[in-house]
Amino acid sequence: MLTLSDFDFDLPPELIAQTALPERSASRLLEVDNTNPSAPPRLVDRRFAELPACVAPGDLLVFNDTKVLKARFFGRKASGGKIEVLIERVTGERTALAQIRASKSPPPGTTLTLADAFDVTVGERVEPFFTLHFPDDCLVLIERHGRLPLPPYIEHAPDAADETRYQTVFAANPGAVAAPTAGLHFDDAVLAALEARGVERATLTLHVGAGTFQPVRVENLAEHRMHSESYELTDALVEKIAATRARGGRVIAVGTTSMRALEAAARDAQAAGRPLAATRAETDIFITPGYRFRVVDRLVTNFHLPKSTLLMLVSAFAGIETIRAAYRHAIDARYRFFSYGDAMLLTRRDDAAEATHGGA
């Protein structure tokens, strides 16, 4: 049985990318060819700008069009005590769920001043979050006064460059507190080259929550509880997936967030005895080796943290030994890791279920 320790590896800290490269598509791309089960994976070092040459006409790329909120606030209580607020999810025009760091948990009815700009009122507790009531449209106030919530392993304060580069060029629907980072490599030139090659594009929305950085704290993976995130698939996306299947093309998820949304929707549809359809729902899907993929054939993804649920996901998709070999190569070749790091292109191995935790 696989345990948390099976997904650990040593990463030199200098390989954690602290800033974005000057050009999005100048990042590196490790193409992993693991289609021959009797041979080691073939690892090809590329530039991300070469991605169009790695996919075929008639394939479908599925992007997550979520937009990162300026979700972090510093503020104070009426007593003058300092607080830090991280918006987790906008739940209404004037309400949101948030994490609050303070010397003492604020009870309902407490007034908090955020960014020396406006006051919010603390409402009911929705574990582990607090409900916040805003005086006006919270999306407007968040965008105007908040700070970009860079990941905890990025050590500098967010600056003007981050406000551009920690968003994808196709970000459209505000609601995330972390970027769908595989999408950060795509620029207009790469998108145009994909279109010229006859590769289709579609979007879904999954609002990435702060739980994406939550560590797994249990050795037995069956005991881990995933955070929940909201997602939406449209009729247009579902129709494009069906058309791609009909012409023999491959569905390529851009990022683990797109993967999780597609697979969650397909799993739930199958459980209900119906085909994949447009949906708006919540998912806490936890994909580990043994999971049977229903939609995604290939995956564009960044390099992930040791012991993370995302490392488990890519291991389920491509095979544990394939991922171990790819990560060893990436470290030896000095690839850049995590959100501002480089990317890899993986292909699903249907025999990758070397152990079972995630279930069908």
Curated annotation (Swiss-Prot):
InterPro entries: QueA, QueA_dom1, QueA_dom2, QueA_sf
GO molecular function: S-adenosylmethionine:tRNA ribosyltransferase-isomerase activity
GO biological process: queuosine biosynthetic process; tRNA wobble guanine modification
Entries under SUPFAM superfamilies matching the protein: QueA-like
Superkingdom classification of source: Bacteria
Transmembrane spans: none
Its EC number(s): 2.4.99.17
Sorted UniProt keywords: Cytoplasm, Queuosine biosynthesis, S-adenosyl-L-methionine, Transferase
Subcellular location: Cytoplasm
Pathway(s) per entry: tRNA modification; tRNA-queuosine biosynthesis
A Pfam family per the record: Queuosine_synth
Subunit structure of this chain's protein: Monomer.
Function as written in the Swiss-Prot or TrEMBL entry: Transfers and isomerizes the ribose moiety from AdoMet to the 7-aminomethyl group of 7-deazaguanine (preQ1-tRNA) to give epoxyqueuosine (oQ-tRNA).
The family this protein is said to belong to: Belongs to the QueA family.
The name this protein goes by in its record: S-adenosylmethionine:tRNA ribosyltransferase-isomerase
Organism of origin: Burkholderia pseudomallei (strain 668)
